[in-house]
């Protein structure tokens, strides 16, 4: 989704000035990282590159919109749990509009109507409730995570539209396509990675998690201050 791309670009600018050291399992995490990189290099990235080369951009955008729409119920429920009823109503309205007028969400009519897109999950809700992120974890196949997200992600998975599909073959196929679409969206971002890739991904993940919990407010202020300092120094 375009929202995630915008956020990731902001995070990439912040990585050099904000560091994280909450990685007590770094030795094991790096071993898992090496394994994941091997799987990605041999399978995930080539398939994602093929998808990106073969599937037209408008079709890719429609697929992205479809999966974003499946997450709107999860978004709206977590907005309520975080004490944001107006945002919850916005996200539920997005689901209704895009499902009805956007052909099951393949077209983002809601954004055209001025309904803002959000990205919420139960891991963020736990963060809003004061649950700490915990130590950084690198999971086999899955990638970056934390104890808080290990609890939150499965619950958000149950709240997503995919979980409600009864046919297991269809559900697995949609889940696989979702993973492929997500990997393809990250191809453009990879070129911006500098230095030790493991450390960069770790800091990006932790910073992005904090950004989501804060709704970008505190980090936006930090970003603005850093840019002001940079411009003044020049």
What are these regions (language model features)?
Residues 23, 124, 129-234:
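A structured, mid-to-C-terminal "fold-capping" secondary-structure block
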Residues 59-62, 82-92, 111-112, 191, ...:
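Surface-exposed patches in mature extracellular/periplasmic domains of secreted proteins
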Residues 50-55, 78-88:
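Helix-loop segments that flank and shape redox-cofactor active sites
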Residues 22-36:
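Short N-terminal segments immediately surrounding and downstream of signal-peptide cleavage
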Residues 1-9:
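Bacterial N-terminal signal peptides that target proteins for export
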Residues 12-21:
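Hydrophobic h-region of N-terminal signal peptides that target proteins for export
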């Amino acid at each position: 989704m375009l929202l995630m791309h915008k956020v990731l670009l902001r995070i990439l600018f912040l990585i050099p000035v904000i560091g994280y050291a909450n990685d007590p399992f770094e030795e094991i995490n790096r071993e898992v990282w090496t394994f994941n990189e091997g799987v990605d290099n041999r399978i995930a990235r080539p398939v994602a590159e093929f998808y990106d080369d073969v599937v037209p951009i408008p079709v890719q955008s429609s697929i992205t919109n479809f999966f974003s729409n499946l997450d709107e119920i999860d978004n709206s429920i977590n907005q309520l749990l975080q004490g944001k009823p107006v945002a919850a109503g916005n996200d539920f309205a997005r689901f209704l509009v895009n499902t009805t007028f956007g052909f099951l969400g393949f077209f983002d009519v809601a954004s055209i109507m001025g309904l803002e897109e959000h990205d919420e999950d139960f891991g963020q809700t736990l963060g809003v409730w004061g649950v700490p992120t915990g130590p950084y974890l690198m999971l086999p196949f899955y990638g970056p995570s934390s104890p808080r997200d290990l609890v939150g992600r499965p619950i958000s998975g149950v709240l997503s539209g995919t979980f409600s599909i009864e046919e297991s073959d269809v559900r697995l196929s949609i889940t696989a396509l979702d993973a492929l679409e997500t990997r393809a969206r990250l191809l453009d971002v990879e070129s911006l990675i500098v230095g030790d890739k493991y450390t960069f991904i770790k800091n990006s993940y932790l910073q992005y998690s904090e950004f989501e919990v804060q709704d970008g407010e505190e980090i936006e202020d930090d970003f603005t201050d850093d840019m002001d300092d940079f411009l003044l120094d020049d």
